[in-house]
Amino acid sequence: MKTAALLSLSILLGTGAAYAQQVSAGRSELMSSVPQTSRTVTDWYKQNVYDPNDNKIGEIMDVLLEPNGQANTAIIGVGGFLGAGEKDVAVKFDSIKSTMKDNKPYLTLDTNKDALKNAPGFKYDSSKTTWVPDNNSK
């Protein structure tokens, strides 16, 4: 699942490549430069998410993409300890704000941990290769 998530996020972040100069090479498109505003997959995947008061409220577990590669949903793991008892919830991808703090990616969401804990839970279904409602989450 981590590989699929990283691949999906790589595709997502690569959509800004339209701004870069492109050189055609057969069926592939090679780039002679990359957009200076581009962000890496690791700026998002497995990164902490904070509320407006700088309290950690969760961690990015996955990003879901539209067929055109546009990100639409972020799965955030909230609660639990070392993964045990954690609940995965879905939020609109564009509701997460990305900035830099101390030269590191800093993700914020305009909500609090309790709101995320009370949101509907999701679980990854490997047979469908996507996230589905988790009717057993609290």
PLM feature spans:
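Peripheral interaction segments used for macromolecular assembly
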Residues: K2-I11, T15-K138
